[in-house]
Amino acid sequence: MHSRGVHRYAGSIVVACITLAFLVGCGNGQSDKSGTFFGPSQSIGNGTAKTYATLDNAGNPIEVGIRLSAASLDGLPEEDAVPPRMLMLDFPDQASATVFDHVMFNWNSHGHEPAVLFGKPHFDFHFYMVDMAAVAEIDPSRPDFATRAANLPDPKYVPLDYVTPPGTPAENTVPAMGLHWVDTTDGLEPGKYNFTQIVINGSWDGTYTFIEPMMTREWMLTKQTIQEDIKQPKSYQKSGYFPTTYGVRYDDEAKEYSISLGGMTMRHAS
């Protein structure tokens, strides 16, 4: 082969290799669906709150949560509005494989009942597994309210150690929220329990409807990082990715708090 032909042949090989590498690189890039995606933000205090979903490179959810700017902890109302102001935060579309629909987020300037346990100023983060219309139907003026409140989920669908408070379900069901369940191992004894942060669960009309982290403003200002296992039920009412961990962390660079439900694991209804 002449030298010119050798050079031309070698050049063709180089071009082919570069083209192949480019195509492989592009293919990998197109298949990588990882990232963190955000829902629309809303104002709270002097800052903002927004939901997010984090996916792995296959597009499966790893974590969902709320990002809360540090300024949100300042400029908060000193008195609660009547009715209370609730932020309804949609998740981004990338959270659709999880069981969560939206987050109801609110600030309690004087805590809430039972005040002997949860009377400190704090935030509630209801991660709902039903849509906003279903939550809005939790209305004590409806004639079937008491019946639907008393329709508790099958025990196999309730996370381990969670029970309803003393009293009837109708008395304990909060309008436009649901019936709150507490963990019997949390030591909720009046006069002894020191509320900093806790995870509540909830139901309505036979359905396990929400997971609710609650935490005081005072505790959040300490900027602690925590990650805890979420207690699981024996079975699941619906198929989808359920969380196995709950976490709180502060990003000093972004000046943001993350309240997360992570360790997403696919579960099947049974």
Range-by-range predicted roles:
Residues H2, H7, A16-F38:
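Bacterial Sec-dependent N-terminal signal peptides
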Residues V6, G11, Y128-V130:
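Alpha-helical and His/Cys-centered functional microenvironments
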Residues R8-Y9, V15, V182, F195:
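Intrinsically disordered, low-complexity, compositionally biased regions/tails
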Residues G29-S270:
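Metal-centered catalytic cores of metalloenzymes
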